[in-house]
Amino acid sequence: MLQVYLVRHGETLWNAARRIQGQSDSPLTEIGIRQAHLVAQRVRNQGITHIISSDLGRTQQTAKIIADACGLTMVTDPRLRELNMGVLENRPIDSLTPEEEQWRKQMVNGTEGARIPEGESMTELGRRMHAALDSCLELPAGSKPLLVSHGMALGCLLSTLLGLPAHAERRLRLRNCSLSRVDYQESPWLASGWVIESAGDTAHLDMPALDELQR
């Protein structure tokens, strides 16, 4: 049975400032760096064989810390990027106009066909996240990969694995450097395919985390 660990990146400057990130970027805060070290210590003896990260800076910074702890080299996969938030990227949440806030609400509430101008739909996000996860099936037998990605991206992936709509990710709280695990099982008596073993585990973090204020 293939086990795949999923980690959200550490807290960033824009998380703390309530600024929309999407596929724009900001570095980890000191808290975010500590979170990354803590999750690295959590997984370092789990037999991880591959560290695969979104190619955005905040995930690479997190993944590098984990890779160093595991004695591995990190590789990147752009399919693990966060949702493209289009014209709202790099905007403080409190600065959105009523029209822009309506775009955001339609997106997160699952309005059919919702998309922020110049951005990406939740359906498109789910499709590429599933493709990134499925590519783990091509790794050598005995592999145990760890993927480093983003809050909405991982929430969308986990929601849709359960057969829920992509926007159900609103109902999953995946805090910075939380740890999730999905397994691929083939069984004549259990559901075959991807199953969720755990989601949003923060037992390794030793400090209160910011809530996902931008969400």
Swiss-Prot record:
Keyword vocabulary terms for this entry: Glycolysis, Isomerase
Gene3D superfamilies on file: Phosphoglycerate mutase-like (3.40.50.1240)
Residues flagged as site, Transition state stabilizer: 150
Pfam families: His_Phos_1
Single GO cellular component term: cytoplasm
Reaction it catalyzes: (2R)-2-phosphoglycerate = (2R)-3-phosphoglycerate
PANTHER family, alphabetized: BROAD-SPECIFICITY PHOSPHATASE YOR283W-RELATED, HISTIDINE PHOSPHATASE FAMILY PROTEIN-RELATED
Protein name listed in UniProt: Probable phosphoglycerate mutase GpmB
Protein's organism: Yersinia pestis
